């Protein structure tokens, strides 16, 4: 392949894979191979190349992924993958327990594919997931997180309930089982988990909204612990933390309270929290959003950046650098959050005198 095509990248020569670069796009080409033993529950110890396509296909995870195509011979489907596609079924190639024992990540992939494609998991494959679930200890938290995130970003994020139903949840990260336990305790319906996450699909399909939707009934601190355990990026963790905090904070249809909340979270996080409230049937959301738009239109100050004075102004008024200036700015911000009309430089400089006298 490297001789035939001028520009290639050695993406995995050990496994017989090179990437052809053509017209600015990359195309992976992999030699047929047979995997050796999986001693670590994730990767084969050895790889043996083979000219036999069937040998390559039978090492695949699921039948729908074990098909090949040639313009000369058409579809090669040794394991009835096309039939499973038609039936909308996730089924392992060969013995499901063997496939999951070889690579425990396949357990999460089965659940994720079922969610993404809105398929069902075949009975033997489902039983094997529950039996081999303890092997997930061999899978890195990053890889587990990637699969769960893909599931939550799919068209059927509500199928996260399958993580509990298959017994996977206790091997995800500390605290993860509590997410499901809390929902089971708080709901009396026949299908509490399915009911709880039924509306997540209505949230924007990004990591922050979907993870916040899933974790919204945990405390913000518990959510952070779970997400850090799964090695999510700091931006997502920060967004989820503040969305949940704002979602759970008591909030009246009142401009002072809304401005106060906006001073602690970003607009993106605030709107995300409102979507979480709406998800749980909070009838105050329309009124809150109406006042939020009025606050925006009026240009009300909700942050230190919007204050009509800055640290330099307070320094000139005789406040000491550091904590005193910081406390002074927060004092003024709190005044302005309650009465936006006070956000004028001369008024605030007069008000800071009251702060100095305290």
Where are these regions (language model features)?
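Catalytic cores of the polymerase beta-like nucleotidyltransferase superfamily
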Residues: 1-358
């Amino acid at each position: 392949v490297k001789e035939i095509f001028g520009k290639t990248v050695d993406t995995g020569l050990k496994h017989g894979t090179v990437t052809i670069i053509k017209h600015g796009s990359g195309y992976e080409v992999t030699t047929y191979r047979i995997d050796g033993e999986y001693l670590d529950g994730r990767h084969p110890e050895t790889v043996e190349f083979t000219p036999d396509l069937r040998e390559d296909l039978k090492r695949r995870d699921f039948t729908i992924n074990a098909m090949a195509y040639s313009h000369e011979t058409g579809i090669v489907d040794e394991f009835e993958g096309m039939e499973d596609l038609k039936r909308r079924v996730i089924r392992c190639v060969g013995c499901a327990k063997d496939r999951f024992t070889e690579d425990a990540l396949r357990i999460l992939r089965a659940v994720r594919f079922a969610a993404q494609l809105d398929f069902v998991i075949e009975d033997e494959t489902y039983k094997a997931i529950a039996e081999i679930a303890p092997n997930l200890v061999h899978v890195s938290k990053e890889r587990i997180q990637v699969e769960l995130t893909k599931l939550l970003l799919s068209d059927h994020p509500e199928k996260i309930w399958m993580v509990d139903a298959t017994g996977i949840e206790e091997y995800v990260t500390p605290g993860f089982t509590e997410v499901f336990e809390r929902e089971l305790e708080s709901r009396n319906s026949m299908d509490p988990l399915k009911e709880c996450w039924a509306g997540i699909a209505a949230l924007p399909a990004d990591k922050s909204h979907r993870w916040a939707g899933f974790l919204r009934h945990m405390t913000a601190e518990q959510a952070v612990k779970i997400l850090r355990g799964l090695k999510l990026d700091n931006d997502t963790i920060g967004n989820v933390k503040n969305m949940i905090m704002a979602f759970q904070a008591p909030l009246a249809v009142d401009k002072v309270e809304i401005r106060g909340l906006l001073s602690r979270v970003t607009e993106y996080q605030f709107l995300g929290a409102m979507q979480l409230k709406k998800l749980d049937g909070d009838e105050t959301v329309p009124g809150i959003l109406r006042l939020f738009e009025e606050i925006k239109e009026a240009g009300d100050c909700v942050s230190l950046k919007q204050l009509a004075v800055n640290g330099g102004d307070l320094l000139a008024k005789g406040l000491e650098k550091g904590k005193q200036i910081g406390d002074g700015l927060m004092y003024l911000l709190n005044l302005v959050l309650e009465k936006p009309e006070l956000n004028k430089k001369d008024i605030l400089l007069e008000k800071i005198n009251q702060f100095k006298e305290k």
